[in-house]
Amino acid sequence: MNIRLYNARILTMEPGREVFYGEVWVKNDKIAYVAEQKELAEEWDKSQFPRIAWDIELDCKGNLLMPGFKNAHTHSGMTFLRSMADDLPLDQWLNKQVFPLEAKLTGEDIYELTRLAVLEYLTSGVTSIFDMYLTPDTIAEACLDTGMRCVLVSGLNNFSSSPKQVEEEFLKWNKKNSLISYQLGFHAEYTCSKELLWKVSEMAHHYRTPVYAHISETKKEVEECKARYGMTPPMFLDSLGTVSYTHLTLPTTER
C-alpha cells in the first residue's frame, strides 16, 4: 500500500528535535521518503520521482507527525478493572478483586476488552505495546484486527497455562506475523513455584531470549520472598539464572 502524508509538521527525532513542514511517503509498510515541502517541490519539478499511484493521501492540516509512542508495560484486557478498588494494597487488590473477576472472563471478553484498549492506545499516539495477559492468541487476534503492533508476553503462573503451552506460543508467534512477536515471562515470584521458574530459566537459556516479570513491587512481596528463600526477589531469581533487570521499586543497595 502506498500512503502519502502531506501538509504536516514533522518531528524526525534527529538531534536538536527539529520540526519542519513537509510530507512523508510510505511504500509497502516502510517509510520511503521524508522531506520539507520546499525541497520536495524542487525535486518534483526536476522530475526526480516517478509518478506514484497513492492508495491513501492524507492532509495532516498542519498537525504534528512523529514516531508513535511505545507502551512497554500493558495488560490490555484489564481495561474493565480501571478505578476498581484502587485504594487497596496490591496483594488485596489482586486476590480480592482482580483474580476473582478475571476467572469469569471468556476469550471473547478479552478480545473485546483488548480492542477497547487499542482504541485508547491509538487515539493517544501509542502504536506499539508490550502486553502480558491471559489468552495471548486472543490478544494477538484483536491487535491484528486493529493494526496494533504487539509484543505478547507470557504471564506464566501456578494457576494458568504451562511451560509447554508458553513454548508453543513462543514458537508460533515469533514467525507468523510482522505485527506480532512473543517474549517469555512469568507473572511474579509469589505466583510461581521454584520448579516453574526453573522451567522458565531453562527456556530462556535454550532460546537465548529475555524474560520479563513483575519483581519487587511491594514491601510485602520482598519480605515474604526473604522468608521463603532467605533472599530478595532479584537475588532469588538471579540464583536461578532467570532474569536481568529493567526497573524495580524496592531494590537493595547491591542491586
Name each model-derived stretch.
Residues 138-245:
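Metal-coordinating catalytic core of metallo-dependent amide/deamination hydrolases
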Residues 82-147, 167-176, 246:
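Alpha-helical scaffold segments that flank or form the walls of functional sites
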Residues 247-255:
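Single conserved hydrophobic/aromatic residue that forms the stacking wall/gate
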Residues 19, 29, 33-37, 61, ...:
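Gly/lys/ser-thr-rich phosphate-binding loops in alpha/beta enzymes
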Residues 8, 24, 29, 62, ...:
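Divalent metal-coordination and catalytic microenvironments
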Residues 1-49:
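N-terminal metal-binding scaffold of metallo-dependent hydrolase/deaminase domains
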Residues 64-100, 207-224, 232-244:
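N-terminal-biased segments
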